[in-house]
Amino acid sequence: MRITAAAAALATLIPAAASAQAYQCRVPGAIPRPHPDLATADQPRRVLPIGGYTLAITWSPGYCRDHGDRPGSQFQCANDNAFGFTLHGLWPDGIGKDWPQYCKSTGILPRRTIAAHLCATPSPQLLQHEWAKHGTCMAGFTPDRYFARSNALYGRLRYPDMDALSRAPLTAGGLSQAMARANPGLRADMMRITADKQGWLDEIWLCLDRRFQYQRCPAHQGGLAPDAGVRIWRGRR
């Protein structure tokens, strides 16, 4: 009842859903070249059957609040660009609790590939990481096909009024319900909300089946409990 009541209270705060989350983005002429991203002892190569996928999106104002001083965050956080939700990545999940990763070695992404997707995932190094760790485990996918797929899934998402939600008491379940209202076919149990230790919104993880359709998230995937409080950072820092 508590989650239902919270969702009902939030319904009045959800106007027509917004789509584009790169409010302002200009790709620079000089794009930093990423370094190789390879398997390590702590992050080993793991080839496993794919049971589904996770589409992870990051709340950029919160990211910039915590990580804006990092050298690799300048494009996203420290210039005239402005973002809402950005695309973290498309992650193959395993059939159980483990997932495939770093399935094969790969070279540095071409500049044109990075430039084409920098306004969705505003970090050349993160793009390199996502392809190396996750994309290489998707059979038959090239970097261009992998990013085209992840950007298509990201691009179809619609969003509630995050500014309005940030000004009212909010739970993870309430945010999930608001996100579901903005996206026909998406239910609250098809996503997970993550936050930092202070309760500031970090990411939303959307659960997909092997056909890239929304599905109920497995219980082991983690995220906040539906009644956990969530705060939304509005400013960059």
Give the residues covered by each predicted segment.
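N-terminal signal peptide c-region/cleavage motif recognized by signal peptidases
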Residues: 15-17
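N-terminal module-boundary/linker segments of secreted carbohydrate-active enzymes
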Residues: 21-64
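Domain-level detector of nuclease and nuclease-like folds
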Residues: 68-237
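Bacterial N-terminal signal peptides that target proteins for export
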Residues: 1-7
